[in-house]
Amino acid sequence: MPNQKNIIITRSLKNDTIKVAKNSQTTFIAMLKKGWDKPIKIKFDFNGENATLNFIAFIIGTKQEKFPFETISNHNVPKTNAHFSVRAAMFDQSEVDYKGNITIKPKPNLTNAYLAHHTLMLSKNAKTHTIP
């Protein structure tokens, strides 16, 4: 079966569980400029082999905007790939609070997962907090 390609582009995040299908390539792009108060949790469940996810978040924080969120990548089967890349530029008193979890079950061999968060602190009052 040929690879199924999915592209998700959003300007906000919400609590959600996204199934990354067998033989699929999913790209999730978030372009965030408006913050929120309560933490948001997004789960990505890999239940089929040869599934790939690219999660890309661009954050521009201004004023007192807050961006608290968590991603969870559950690799339940072998031969899955996940790449999480969070980039932020924080101005004024803005804050980004990112927690990234990658869970690989004992039997999913040949799984590849990567997570990175890079923030430009463009104000002495801006804050960033990352838990990989």
Which residue ranges define each predicted feature?
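Conserved beta-strand/loop scaffold segments within soluble protein domains that form the structured core
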Residues: 1-132
